Every structure is written in structure tokens, then in C-alpha cells.
From Swiss-Prot:
Presence of keyword Disulfide bond: no
The protein's name in its UniProt record: Large ribosomal subunit protein uL3
HAMAP family, per database record: Ribosomal_uL3_A
One GO term of the biological process aspect: translation
Record InterPro entries: L3_arc_euk, Ribosomal_L3_dom_3_arc_sf, Ribosomal_uL3, Ribosomal_uL3_arc, Ribosomal_uL3_CS, Transl_B-barrel_sf
A family per Pfam: Ribosomal_L3
Annotated region (Disordered), positions in chain: 1-31, 246-271
Family: Belongs to the universal ribosomal protein uL3 family.
Keywords linked to the UniProt accession: Ribonucleoprotein, Ribosomal protein, RNA-binding, rRNA-binding
Quaternary structure and partners: Part of the 50S ribosomal subunit. Forms a cluster with proteins L14 and L24e.
GO molecular function, one term: structural constituent of ribosome
């Protein structure tokens, strides 16, 4: 008989379907954590992937066999220049019981960030003269009154923030990336005051995260293009020649003639998928690039010129890709202090 006599686990994960290209290069998280903090703060930040290196540090994981000893740790370097909040969005529950935007307030100070007109061209019409700027204030002044009058209905606030890629010459672009970041902690009134205070001002990553804490990483993986079932689903390659002569890097059958089941491995897009990696520890946050730049710079990136962070292990995405950093939604452990680093590799990455 030609049928197989032994069962095997299905290939691929149904939780990762559909395996298609991401619609956006910098995705916004779908879930935000609830933090117990009396003071409001942003729950996320945006950085750009530089590359990987390694450090030696004192292991401070409790109950670890190497606790208190020096260990080798691979790290990922991200360049994180300050971000600028441009607008405040208020969300309230609609008739369907789902949170939805009720209004959006833009501060006049947001227009000082001129690079935003490269992304939102309609804002350039408010920069022509003083009269156009006055129209801008009149248009969005009523939005702020609407937010204050509906404060009891509002579920949460989010800030529309812009990155500053102009400060990173290695990226070779000036158009900022826009993303929404939710405000957590404190009461609604305190969150509103916090948002109005930071609109149009630079926010550093030190205002959001601290060394030693766990965060989640949201981004888009490396694109691999069109791939077969062997690489895409890790299907076992069929025997060659003495078993059949119709190919080996394929599946034996796609199923009955009435139609192919959705769980049957088939070739298609591999990579450039939106993914989330949980509980990545921040090893270090530094302002001096000389502490991390290797001899000759990072391959396919160059040298770091702004504030940087070191994350434990590897993360998704290619070099120069924007990565969203979020407060951990389910941290496995809460560290009180930052790890002690004894050595940072600064040798050339070019071989």
C-alpha cells in the first residue's frame, strides 16, 4: 500500500497564519499592559536596529547555576534618538462597545517639527504665514475642549509620536516614522496634563525605560521572498530516486481532490511577517557611542551617533529597520537593578 502507516505532527503553526507580508514596516502593538504607577508615562518607544555584539556580565538571575559569576551574553544594539509627540488621541467606547477615536488634538508647538510635513503634506498649508498658524490653533482648540468635556467617557489616551531619522546618518532618510503610543499610569486627568505638557517636546528613552527591566519587541522579520515547503514549513524531504522520480523537496499529497485543506503545507511568502517577541531584557542604556562602536563600525550600518540600548539576545528584523519597544505585558521576572557589565566587545566586525 502507498499510504503511510505512522502518524506525524502537523507542520507549521496555525497561530502564525496568514503567512503574508506585513502591511506596515513599523506596526503598532495591539495590546498594552496595565501598570501600577502614580505618575503617567509612555508605554513604548521606537528604535532602529544596528546589529549584534557580545558582552561579559555578572549573572544576576535568581536560582541560576551561574548566579554571581561572569557569563558571556550576546546582545543586540539599537540606536534610539529622542521621539517627539505631535498629537493627542482620545479613545472612548462607541455604540458597538469597542474603543474608538473620538477626537484628535494637535498642539501648535508640533508644527515646529518641520520634518512632519514630509510625512503629512497637508500640514504644510498651516506654515505659510501667521494667519494660517492662527487657523491651525482655532481648528484644534475646540478639539481640546471636547476632550476635557468628555473626560469621564474616555477609556485611554494615546500620543501620535514621530521619530527623528535625520539624526541617524546611517539610515539615509529624513521622513519620520509615525506610531501611536499609549499613556499608562495615574488618573485620566493626570494623563491629560502629562500629554499636554510633552506635546512638541523631545522624549528620551530614559524617560520611558530603565536598565535591567524586561520589554517586548514588536516589528517585521527579515523578508525571504517566495519559498518552498522545505524551508517554509520544515517538511521532511522525501527519499530520492529509488522511491520516486517526481521530486523530493515537496509534500507527498495535498489531500483529497475536493480541495486542499488550509493546514496543508504549500509554498509561498516567507519572512517580512509582523511578529512580537516577549521579555527581552535591557542590559544597558548609554549616551556615549564610543562605549559600543567597534573598530570600523557595524557592518551594513556604520557607527552609532545617538543614545543606544543593548538588549539581551537577538531580535527580529534586519539592520536599519524600525523596532517598537513596549512595556512587558507578562514579565517573567522583575529585576531591581541593572546587570553589572565587565567587558564590551569593540573588536572589528569585518573579519
Amino acid at each position: 500500500m502507498g499510504h503511510r502507516k505512522l502518524a506525524s505532527p502537523r507542520r507549521g503553526s496555525a497561530g502564525l497564519r496568514p503567512r503574508k507580508r506585513s502591511s506596515e514596516l513599523l506596526p503598532t502593538p495591539r495590546t498594552w499592559p496595565q501598570i501600577n504607577s502614580p505618575n503617567p508615562k509612555l508605554l513604548g518607544f521606537v528604535g532602529y536596529k544596528v546589529g549584534m555584539s557580545h558582552v561579559f556580565m555578572i549573572d544576576d538571575w535568581p536560582n541560576s547555576p551561574t548566579n554571581g559569576k561572569e557569563i558571556y551574553m550576546p546582545v543586540t544594539v539599537l540606536e534610539v534618538p529622542p521621539i517627539i509627540p505631535l498629537a493627542l488621541r482620545a479613545y472612548a467606547v462607541d455604540g458597538k462597545g469597542e474603543p474608538n477615536v473620538i477626537t484628535e488634538y494637535w498642539s501648535p508647538s508640533s508644527l515646529q517639527f518641520l520634518d512632519i510635513t514630509r510625512r503629512i503634506h497637508s500640514l504644510s498649508s498651516f506654515l505659510k504665514n501667521d494667519e494660517s498658524k492662527k487657523k491651525f490653533e482655532e481648528k484644534f482648540g475646540s478639539k481640546l475642549d471636547l476632550i476635557k468635556s468628555n473626560l469621564d467617557r474616555i477609556v485611554y489616551f494615546r500620543l501620535l509620536v514621530a521619530t527623528q531619522p535625520r539624526k541617524i546618518p546611517s539610515l539615509g532618510k529624513k521622513v519620520p516614522d509615525l506610531v501611536e503610543i499609549q499613556i499608562g499610569g495615574g488618573e485620566k486627568k493626570a494623563q491629560l496634563d502629562y500629554a499636554l505638557n510633552v506635546l512638541g517636546k523631545e522624549i528620551s528613552i530614559k524617560d520611558v525605560f530603565k536598565e535591567g527591566q524586561l520589554i517586548d519587541v514588536v516589528g517585521v522579520t527579515k523578508g525571504k521572498g517566495f519559498a518552498g515547503v522545505i524551508k517554509r514549513y520544515s517538511v521532511v524531504e522525501l527519499p530520492r530516486w529509488h522511491k520516486h522520480r517526481k521530486g523530493s523537496r515537496k509534500i507527498g499529497t495535498r489531500g483529497p481532490s475536493l480541495g486542499t485543506p488550509s493546514y496543508t503545507p504549500q509554498p509561498g511568502q516567507l519572512g517580512f511577517h509582523r511578529r512580537t517577541e516577549y521579555n527581552k531584557r535591557i542590559i544597558k542604556i548609554g549616551d556615549d557611542p564610543k562605549e559600543i562602536n567597534p573598530a570600523g563600525g557595524f557592518v551594513r550600518y556604520g557607527i552609532v551617533r545617538n543614545t543606544y540600548i543593548l538588549l539581551e539576545g537577538s531580535i527580529l528584523g534586519s539592520k536599519k529597520r524600525p523596532i517598537f519597544l513596549r512595556e512587558a505585558v507578562r514579565p517573567s521576572y522583575v529585576f531591581e537593578n541593572a546587570p553589572k557589565i565587565t567587558y564590551v566587545n569593540l573588536l572589528s566586525k569585518q573579519g
